[in-house]
Amino acid sequence: MDRSEIVARENPVITQRVTNLLQTNAPLLFMPIDIHEVRYGAYTLFMYGSLENGYKAEVRIENIPVFFDVQIESSNTNQLFLKSLLSAENITYERLETLTQRPVMGYREKEKEFAPYIRIFFKSLYERRKAITYLNNMGYNTAADDTTCYYRMVSRELKLPLTSWIQLQHYSYEPHGLVHRFSVTPEDLVSYQDDGPTDHSIVMAYDIETYSPVKGTVPDPNQANDVVFMICMRIFWIHSTEPLASTCITMAPCKKSSEWTTILCSSEKNLLLSFAEQFSRWAPDICTGFNDSRYDWPFIVEKSMQHGILEEIFNKMSLFWHQKLDTILKCYYVKEKRVKISAEKSIISSFLHTPGCLPIDVRNMCMQLYPKAEKTSLKAFLENCGLDSKVDLPYHLMWKYYETRDSEKMADVAYYCIIDAQRCQDLLVRHNVIPDRREVGILSYTSLYDCIYYAGGHKVCNMLIAYAIHDEYGRIACSTIARGKREHGKYPGAFVIDPVKGLEQDKPTTGLDFASLYPSLIMAYNFSPEKFVASREEANSLMAKGESLHYVSFYFNNRLVEGWFVRHNNVPDKMGLYPKVLIDLLNKRTALKQELKKLGEKKECIHESHPGFKELQFRHAMVDAKQKALKIFMNTFYGEAGNNLSPFFLLPLAGGVTSSGQYNLKLVYNFVINKGYGIKYGDTDSLYITCPDSLYTEVTDAYLNSQKTIKHYEQLCHEKVLLSMKAMSTLCAEVNEYLRQDNGTSYLRMAYEEVLFPVCFTGKKKYYGIAHVNTPNFNTKELFIRGIDIIKQGQTKLTKTIGTRIMEESMKLRRPEDHRPPLIEIVKTVLKDAVVNMKQWNFEDFIQTDAWRPDKDNKAVQIFMSRMHARREQLKKHGAAASQFAEPEPGERFSYVIVEKQVQFDIQGHRTDSSRKGDKMEYVSEAKAKNLPIDILFYINNYVLGLCARFINENEEFQPPDNVSNKDEYAQRRAKSYLQKFVQSIHPKDKSVIKQGIVHRQCYKYVHQEIKKKIGIFADLYKEFFNNTTNPIESFIQSTQFMIQYFDGEQKVNHSMKKMIEQHATASNRAGNPAGNPAGNALMRAIFTQLITEEKKIVQALYNKGDAIHDLLTYIINNINYKIATFQTKQMLTFEFSSTHVELLLKLNKTWLILAGIHVAKKHLQALLDSYNNEPPSKTFIQQAIEEECGSIKPSCYDFIS
């Protein structure tokens, strides 16, 4: 069944009416979905979408004028000059027209308001672009100069939205298979002002299943043996979740089902061709999948390339244009499209964009709607929306079913795949994605593709131009090309009143907020680029003529920026472009919100089974989409005005808005203070105010004269809240009147939303309390929280739970007569319970999430991913599955826990087990499977204590000296240190670890001192050899004999020892004074000669003992950890000897003595710890352990060591 048959079956009445209209060439309604341009030769615009009944349609718009405007000084003298300029550059144009427009930058008085422009017409976009580039380089100001997407300019000029119903008139019509082709001119297109009929565009939701013979890996399209073995597709009306048809294309036999049509293919190549064939039969307007732009489309395209069928597939799927492979890859396969998710995050998408079908990745849409979502899986988004979940089918089972070709089991796979596709449409409809984006397109004169794949800034810019160019807004000439030097710097910061930190339990606090501060400032002060006056001279001249100006000044990059804006004084004709647009948007939104309220009230009165409920629901969704679109534009308006890459950017305007915000908040602050009110906190656009004590005198006295029960106190609090609400309502009206008198307009207004009581301020933009909106409500389970980290992305349940307990406990109503525990006491009580009663916590309380961004220096995540990579490689070597350690996609969030590692110390008592977060992280599945212990103390110290410190850092003991600049940071650091010590005192395991470290350090210190003594003895012996100036050789021999007496046995001469002595003698020779015969060098040569000739017996004995020394060293090294020994040897050799000549002679002795000492400490450390109760081990005990160990090394050298 193809699209036309489905349309005829589902909409027979409308289809008959549309058929009659086509036969009589009567006007038709058309809903555009996709836009394509023919930019070579004569410009042609193609619009693809559906007719009223659902027929697929192509609208070809011809005879579209191609032009741009250039500003000139005189309409009489410059046309010829402009012609000569273009001719000199061989730029071909059709004709020139002279017109007048208002330049967008700079104020112009009434008589000079309009400037002459020449509109240059061309036959092609190529010539137009050449001319724009040339004239801009020559310094001319151009307008209507879009160089990327000309269709946006067409939409603006014709006032023809590209995402709403259009009426086709005087068209030529040609049926072409499933497609109904129309040819029109711009005059034949009329924007349909009403909401129009129900849209019957078709959405195809799909999902693919892939297979790899390498178990535990994600199938890779670049691997020849990895295949796509199933593609399931479902089609819907754009507004519905009821499927119109379903198809399963599979390479494995699948049991038949009434829910879908099954197509069995013999190969992957045939499966892909069948997918294209089915796609062409349904001719969808929108194609959607979940994460398909990151996996499904790249897999399909890559496999099609490998089979050599991409060109055939594209041309089957595209009902309109057939293309060659190189053109497909260049123009229609979007390999890397950056989609903005939030201000901080973007994601790369890849897809095949066939003309007439708009691809939409549902995952991207959901991530934009929930930019702080910790999980971005299909299952997570479905749960978040309360929709039915996807089918649970593990990949290893799916692959097993595919391998066995079990038709019944493959039916389960098909159902799994079909439901995944179904859930994509469920999410699109639930979130009203298409209607919302369409309303944005209607306002901004952009396409649906623009609304999905581009950020909000360019839409605001396009909307501004659309308003500006028409007569009712003054025919302002706007360029789309950013000009001038683009400086980077900070605009004036917000006016901030530091919070009065701590818990407020006696007086309610009320927040007064400016309603949409920046848009309101733009409307109030007429901030608009064409109202800007740059020079003081011109400003004085205008004021002398009676004009009212608003002066702005601020410092930017250490220089004063100033300017003036001509005020409108509430005269509509004097309003600038920006205020006019904002006022229009505000009025439209106000009307829509009123309508939305009425529709909502109707919905509550009608049951879902009522015949008119669905229509009412549809109307409610459409109105809501419109008001949301207006809200988006109003909120992003200032962002574009302050964007230095925007063609509308004006530095005095951007900074003037923020500095005016400062001024007005200060104005209100002083007004409120002078009225006797108190200020708890103020920032940017809001003040938190307390009423005078006198307001509560009567109710307080009534309580004091009562029995002061808890009920009486609750009544007192209740009445305080009511009094505050009434007082704030009056104050708010007075503030707004004061603002009106100051700025002369009613656009800048404040409103109060709620009364907070009790309330606690913990820092800038950080506070919580109980909010009372319309009536008093002292429910501690519904707290008003701003900026407290328990709602931070990635935060654990542990932190959220502890933070919530502290806040809820602190918000309890307590009479002044009762004990009111200070916040620090509440924090310590909650913390103690959390640390001591560990059994209350579940595994899920410790799960965290983080994002994998390879290009960012997140050390913990980088270390963790490096460890996981090493594990995967190790498992692959052994042929084991490694999917549990798979790396997430860049930008994707993953879940993990921090696990406990075994406590280890080095010989000096320093912790050697890694405390780095990245070394303790484990995937949740791995930690659960192996039952790894959670490092609770790590969570407490690194996540919980920072939050808890925020609650108590206002305490006097944590306050910094006067000379500290960042007082909040200082107090926070001191408070956290205080809580760390508190946790150490109550955490039994932490106390044990500290004691172990003390024992290690004591043991090391004693052993180190003993070894230094032994080394000192031998150092003194050999120093005597040098100090004996009368007979040094004899002194050396005696010292050597002293050493040799501790060894016995005859062995062969150790030639390596002889080499060492020879090398040392040579090195010493090089180090000596080359002039004359230095005594040191001569002495060494004499020693060497005597060793070889005169004292052969003693030397022979020394050589013989060399083997014994080497044997001893080998024994020691083989019985201890060599790496630790080597490291600690370097650490312990911190003392020096007076003569470098003895270094070699001491080297052997020092080395094996130190190694023996380390061996002692290492060997007996556990015994020391096991015997350790509450007191450190005695010196006698340690000495005894050392003597026992030294004796066990080798009996013959016991005395020598001990």
Swiss-Prot record:
A Pfam family annotated for this UniProt entry: DNA_pol_B
Record's keyword terms, sorted: DNA replication, DNA-binding, DNA-directed DNA polymerase, Early protein, Nucleotidyltransferase, Repeat, Transferase, Viral DNA replication
Positions of the UniProt region annotated as 3 X 4 AA tandem repeats of A-G-[NK]-[PA]: 1071-1082
SMART domains in the cross-refs: POLBc
GO molecular function: DNA binding; DNA-directed DNA polymerase activity; nucleotide binding
Transmembrane segments: none
Induction: Expressed in the early phase of the viral replicative cycle.
InterPro entries cross-referenced by the UniProt entry: DNA-dir_DNA_pol_B (IPR006172), DNA-dir_DNA_pol_B_CS (IPR017964), DNA-dir_DNA_pol_B_exonuc (IPR006133), DNA-dir_DNA_pol_B_multi_dom (IPR006134), DNA/RNA_pol_sf (IPR043502), DNA_pol_B_thumb (IPR042087), DNA_pol_palm_dom_sf (IPR023211), DNA_pol_type-B (IPR050240)
Intervals holding Sequence repeats: 1071-1074, 1075-1078, 1079-1082
Note: Consistent with its intracellular location, ASFV encodes its own replicative DNA polymerase and three base excision repair enzymes: a class II AP endonuclease, the repair polymerase Pol X, and an ATP-dependent DNA ligase.
Classification via PANTHER family: DNA POLYMERASE CATALYTIC SUBUNIT, DNA POLYMERASE DELTA CATALYTIC SUBUNIT
Similarity remark: Belongs to the DNA polymerase type-B family.
Role noted for this protein: DNA-directed DNA polymerase involved in viral DNA replication.
Protein name: DNA polymerase beta
Organism: African swine fever virus (isolate Tick/South Africa/Pretoriuskop Pr4/1996)
Gene field: DPOL
